[in-house]
Amino acid sequence: MMERLKIAYPVITEGKYDKIKLESLIEAHILCTDGFGIFKDTEKQAFLRRLCDKTKIIVLTDADGAGLVIRNFINSILPKERLIHLYIPQCAGKEKRKTTPAAEGFLGVEGLPPDLLRSLFAPFADNGPKNG
């Protein structure tokens, strides 16, 4: 198994399965929006604002409409200059744990190949290859 990438910035992702997948690939403080739950969770919103005062935050959501809505909401409540947006490609398929594909037919963060996710985080890793 490859060494997990050490990421200094906290990471926001959508759900617990995304978090589990990321934890297998990176060492970072990983937070979940609980899907659309972030919209009404004022405590979590306040926590994210306080966190943004101290550090930049990486945002990684699914490549579907719901992921875009969540990403835009995060953009609206946090200072844009403190956010690092990572984007996954729209890959057709279904996650192994699901019986049917998602509504839009794309894999979410949890369903993507590990190498693809590692390549997204590599530029921010303390122990990995740097791009640029």
PLM features per residue range, with description:
Residues 1-13:
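A short, flexible N-terminal coil/short beta segment enriched in small residues
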Residues 5, 24, 38-132:
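TOPRIM fold recognition
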Residues 9, 29, 56-57:
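The start of beta-strands in P-loop NTPase/AAA+ ATPase cores
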Residues 12, 31, 84-87:
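Hydrophobic/aromatic beta-strand patches that form the interior of the parallel beta-sheet core
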Residues 13-14, 61:
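Short beta-strand scaffold positions
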Residues 16-21, 44:
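Short, glycine/polar-rich helix-capping loops at beta-to-alpha or helix-loop-helix junctions
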Residues 28-40:
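A short beta-strand-loop structural module common to alpha/beta enzyme folds
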